[in-house]
Amino acid sequence: MAQTLYDKLWQSHVVDTGDDGTTVLYIDRHLLHEVTSPQAFEGLKLAGRRPWRVSANLMVADHNVPTTDRSEGIADPTSRLQVETLDHNAHEYGLTYFSMRDKRQGIVHVIGPEQGATLPGMTVVCGDSHTSTHGAFGALAHGIGTSEVEHVLATQTLLAQKSKAMLVQVDGALPVGVTAKDIVLAIIGKIGTAGGTGYAIEFAGSTIRSLSMEGRMTICNMAIEAGARAGMVAVDETTINYVKGRPLSPVGPHWDRAVEYWRTLHSDVGAKFDLVVTLNAAEVKPQVSWGTSPEMVVSVDGRVPDPDKEKDATKRDGMEKALVYMGLKPNTPITDIRIDKVFIGSCTNSRIQDLRAAAAVVRGKHRASNVKLAMVVPGSGLVKEQAEREGLDKIFKDAGFEWREPGCSMCLAMNADRLEPGERCASTSNRNFEGRQGAGGRTHLVSPAMAAAAGIEGHFVDVRAL
């Protein structure tokens, strides 16, 4: 019987299935950070248990770490306590840990693939909603809650219900200036933030195949923003070439056997999906979100939508509230929206390819006078090192952009990087919820190139015209 990629990944990890469909699923890789793990470790300690499979766990501090000078540690007491607790638990249980001062430290969804901790065919979980990022490698990856973090630590398994399967087929040549971020925003704009609810999404088609692993990670990262449990891409040569030689990748005969298996990780011809969505990449333009949900997005040459033209009363009400919060009026051209700050970073867009794209836009130019702050936050210490070897840091600094240390930063404002009330930000992150980047802050989701262009011009512009 023809199987989808999701079917193959699921079935190869089933330990047992109950009469109600509840499945005990084996977990290959468990990623942990400082925000969702403290209670899990405390529960483990109170129960007198220890991690079942020490080598399956990889820990890193990312949400609360400062992106400025780290020589004096973390000023905020709550943030400091969370990181210190992570440090203690790592040493207490002998788990691999990249501390704040380790050059391998970075955002958990950047360092996992970077280290080869994420490999094709794996089940990958983390107490973080954007764990779907790792599905780009032909893996089954999704976020879990704190109680589930404890369960995985103790048993190396997870109780789960199988999702339905959705295929998002993207075909066509990607236009110049249009990126993976624009593709995934266009997908979410098409199906909505609830469109993927109850599904695991496989992203396929010639456009997806043409993307680098960085681009595929961006796509899968935001599968959760479409409501999906997981996002994934079939394995191909791009996947295999990326993971080869990584610190935790197999070597020698183990590599050969692994590659042989990885090449089977694709949906079979004739496999049935519960839902199929198509998108013509040639029609996609650079995207800019205008509201307080990722589905509230339009092309850069468009206008802020008019709620009066929305027939659905619930959607109309949401649009009206979003416009009030965002301080925007219907029919305003997107290119007339001025910004106060720029954030280039997050687990969506902080990899070397993202930084190169942004640097190419700002090279030889300077930040607009009305832009108070433009910050670039690499996804890991290793990304930062590579960017500096390529001279990208100098390009950004010469353009008036700040070059920071790695971490989650302004994506969710859990450290000192945040917006003030009313400030408007061109952000390469994944969520534009109310207060996401700071109380009263207004977030517009864009690609790295679009964020960089807005920082130079002081308002949104079509990067294709630069």
From Swiss-Prot:
Pathway connected to this protein: Amino-acid biosynthesis; L-leucine biosynthesis; L-leucine from 3-methyl-2-oxobutanoate: step 2/4
Alphabetically ordered keywords of this record: 4Fe-4S, Amino-acid biosynthesis, Branched-chain amino acid biosynthesis, Iron, Iron-sulfur, Leucine biosynthesis, Lyase, Metal-binding
Binding site for [4Fe-4S] cluster: 347, 408, 411
GO terms for biological process, alphabetical: L-leucine biosynthetic process
Pfam family, one: Aconitase
EC number: 4.2.1.33
InterPro entries xrefs: 3-IsopropMal_deHydase_lsu, Acnase/IPM_dHydase_lsu_aba_1/3, Acoase/IPM_deHydtase_lsu_aba, Aconitase_4Fe-4S_BS, Aconitase_4Fe-4S_dom, IPM_dehydratase_rel_enz, IPMI_cat
Cofactor(s) in the UniProt record: [4Fe-4S] cluster
Cofactor note: Binds 1 [4Fe-4S] cluster per subunit.
Catalytic activity, as annotated: (2R,3S)-3-isopropylmalate = (2S)-2-isopropylmalate
One annotated GO molecular function: metal ion binding
Family statement drawn from the similarity comment of this UniProt entry: Belongs to the aconitase/IPM isomerase family. LeuC type 1 subfamily.
Assembly information from the UniProt record: Heterodimer of LeuC and LeuD.
NCBIfam families: leuC (TIGR00170), PRK05478.1 (NF004016), PRK12466.1 (NF009116)
Protein's job: Catalyzes the isomerization between 2-isopropylmalate and 3-isopropylmalate, via the formation of 2-isopropylmaleate.
Name by which UniProt lists this protein: 3-isopropylmalate dehydratase large subunit
Organism per entry: Herminiimonas arsenicoxydans
Organism phylogeny: Bacteria, Pseudomonadati, Pseudomonadota, Betaproteobacteria, Burkholderiales
